Swiss-Prot record:
Catalytic activity entry: Specifically hydrolyzes mismatched double-stranded DNA and polynucleotides, releasing free uracil
Chief site of localization: cytoplasm
Family: Belongs to the uracil-DNA glycosylase (UDG) superfamily. TDG/mug family.
Pfam families reported for this sequence: UDG
GO cellular component, as recorded: cytoplasm
Physiological role: Excises ethenocytosine and uracil, which can arise by alkylation or deamination of cytosine, respectively, from the corresponding mispairs with guanine in ds-DNA. It is capable of hydrolyzing the carbon-nitrogen bond between the sugar-phosphate backbone of the DNA and the mispaired base. The complementary strand guanine functions in substrate recognition. Required for DNA damage lesion repair in stationary-phase cells.
Metal-binding keyword on record: no
Protein name: G/U mismatch-specific DNA glycosylase
Amino acid sequence: MISDILAPGLRVVFCGINPGKSSAHTGFHFAHPGNRFWKVIHQAGFTDRQLRPEEELQLLDTRCGITMLVERPTVQASEVALQELRSGGRELVRKIEEYQPQALAVLGKQAFELAFNQRGAKWGKQAITIGTTQVWVLPNPSGLNRATLDKLVAAYRELDDALATRGQ
């Protein structure tokens, strides 16, 4: 079982789609060696150094957290059913209302659209909020995503810069 990394007063909560088999096996978020999450958030400015999956709790020191839309592990996110995403979206809203981070970053456009019943989402900041929490859609850092490391870092840096502009 993989646990959420949540606390009050966070700058951002990164929301993955669901755990992969490597994460399920190790118990840590974004644990597959091909997943670029830890490298991306470091290069985008969220962490001072590149954390390893087993150091995930240190994210709280940077006022960042992690949750996921669906708890069930799969080999690929495409194996997650629509009902699971919709249910996960409702649960995610509940968590965000409870913890009230400055921003929620959903990692994947299609997952965001399905979980929140939105159409035509663009990358970046969304028009919707959850209370006062900004909602962002960022590319998924999975190695299966064809986005280059530079494009991932640029997308995540936009969020880091926006939070810095808000003094967060």
